[in-house]
UniProtKB/Swiss-Prot annotation:
GO terms for molecular function: metal ion binding; RNA endonuclease activity. Mg(2+) binds at residue 8. Transmembrane segments: none annotated. GO terms for biological process: defense response to virus; maintenance of CRISPR repeat elements. CRISPR (clustered regularly interspaced short palindromic repeat), is an adaptive immune system that provides protection against mobile genetic elements (viruses, transposable elements and conjugative plasmids). CRISPR clusters contain sequences complementary to antecedent mobile elements and target invading nucleic acids. CRISPR clusters are transcribed and processed into CRISPR RNA (crRNA). Functions as a ssRNA-specific endoribonuclease. Involved in the integration of spacer DNA into the CRISPR cassette. The keyword Phosphoprotein does not apply. Its EC number is 3.1.-.-. Belongs to the CRISPR-associated endoribonuclease Cas2 protein family. This is CRISPR-associated endoribonuclease Cas2. Homodimer, forms a heterotetramer with a Cas1 homodimer. The lineage of its organism: Bacteria, Bacillati, Bacillota, Bacilli, Lactobacillales. The keyword Ion transport does not apply. It is an enzyme of class 3 (hydrolase). InterPro entries: CRISPR_associated_Cas2, Virulence_VapD/CRISPR_Cas2.
Length: 109
């Protein structure tokens, strides 16, 4: 299953921008993938992982702004249509799992 997270936060003051950056870093550290500026998704193995993620989101909920969550099956997520100006090179629509062990890959020259 996939959790789709959409959020809207104010960024008018320095404090609001700091809260936005902190929340975004939290999402990335939890394994969310950015689809658009305020739309992220995360692959979840089962409903208990979904419940646990919701609890962590509640703990890290910013004081200002709105967060919307939608959980869909992999089949529903795979039917998502991406319309963009270039060829689709997104890995976000894949249900493949990647596991990186050890150090980062060397840069190709």
């Amino acid at each position: 299953m996939r959790m789709i997270l959409m959020f809207d936060m104010p960024t008018d003051t320095a404090e609001e921008r700091k809260a936005y950056r902190k929340f975004r870093k939290f999402l990335l550290s939890e394994g969310f993938i950015m689809h658009q500026f305020s739309v992220y998704s995360k692959l979840l193995l089962n409903n208990s992982a979904n419940t646990a993620m919701i609890a962590r989101l509640k703990e890290n909920n910013p004081k200002k702004g709105n967060i919307t969550l939608l959980t869909v099956t992999e089949k529903q997520f795979a039917r998502m249509i991406y319309l963009n100006g270039e060829r689709d090179t997104s890995i976000a629509n894949s249900d493949s799992r990647l596991v990186f062990l050890g150090e980062a890959f060397p840069d190709e020259t």
